[in-house]
Amino acid sequence: MKQPFIIAGLLCMLLIGTLSGCVGPVATETLTKTYAATDATVMTVSNLNGQVDITGWNGDTIVLTTVKRSSVGQADLKNINISVTTSGGHFDVKTIYTGSSMTQPSVDLTLKVPYNVTIDTVSNSNGAIHLTSTKGDTVLSTSNGAILVDHVNGYVSAATSNAYVEIKGTTGIDGAHTSNGAISVEVQSLRDDITIGTSNAAVTVYLNPSLNATVDAATSNARVTVEGITLNTSLLQETHVIGTLGTADHRIEIRTSNGNVYLYNL
């Protein structure tokens, strides 16, 4: 009676192996290249699966290190192309995969960029983004990966899902969004109305007391805490606070559900 079950099990294993592409030891390939840059260089980065790490440095070149990984063998690494194009002052990095849609290779991109290079956009399909000591009004987007920003000479907006967002040491922010992940941001200055939002997690916002803005902070099933900063409040409830810093030139809307909101002095 055991034979039919053995045959069925072997057939299931064969089917799984066919669908997954014969998963085996992870093949890797690491490559470092150096590129020229000027103070007028504007950079964009677009990746698939993996981490993107961009750090400013005092050199005069862009150093790009790529780490390719594939679970279906060394041959699949040839299907991963890191496209670098330079035209009209733009420096664009893009990961392109031409292999089977049944596999999910990954690429880690690590870039050292001169401090005066402007970082325009950084996008990633699945993975973290780290941005440190750079310049530019930068738009960051990914999913299933944290976004960590530290010391950027410019305004930053960040959007991800199922992961943490942290923005500190920037000129200002244009917004921060995630789901099922906490947010911690410093708001040094504003150039427009912004929203900061997540779900099922806490939001911590450090506010420059010199801001001119209306702060509207609310949560569904937790509480809003204001500490160390004075708001001219028009609404003061456990789950919803509306107050003004200076004049109401801009609006900061903060939202979460099933998580606390903390407003602190920067």
Regions found by a protein language model. Name each.
Residues 47, 121-124, 131-133, 142, ...:
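Extended beta-sheet lipid-handling architectures
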